[in-house]
UniProtKB/Swiss-Prot annotation:
This protein's GO CC annotations: cytosolic large ribosomal subunit
Organism whose genome encodes this protein: Wolinella succinogenes (strain ATCC 29543 / DSM 1740 / CCUG 13145 / JCM 31913 / LMG 7466 / NCTC 11488 / FDC 602W)
Name listed for the protein in its UniProt record: Large ribosomal subunit protein bL35
GO annotation terms (biological process): translation
Keywords: Ribonucleoprotein, Ribosomal protein
TM regions (residue ranges): none
Domain of life: Bacteria
Phylogenetic lineage: Bacteria, Pseudomonadati, Campylobacterota, Epsilonproteobacteria, Campylobacterales
Family per similarity comment: Belongs to the bacterial ribosomal protein bL35 family.
């Protein structure tokens, strides 16, 4: 049986942190002038994959 291959796009977007999968935050790459400093600071906080998507992300990362 061939080796499982990690989805390379997913590998670049998600990082494994202890028992959680860390992900990036959307809406922080451009059009930042209309967003308040408080809102932009909130976008820098770490985000984690929710339980509904956890199994599918684990399959992409060959962790299942």
């Amino acid at each position: 049986m061939p080796k499982m291959k990690t989805n390379r796009g997913a590998a670049k977007r998600f990082k494994l942190k202890k028992n959680l999968i860390k992900r990036g935050s959307a809406f922080k790459s451009h059009i930042l002038t209309k967003k308040s400093a408080k809102r932009k600071a909130g976008l820098n906080e770490p985000k984690y994959v929710n339980d509904a998507n956890l199994d599918s992300i684990k399959k992409l990362l060959c962790m299942a």
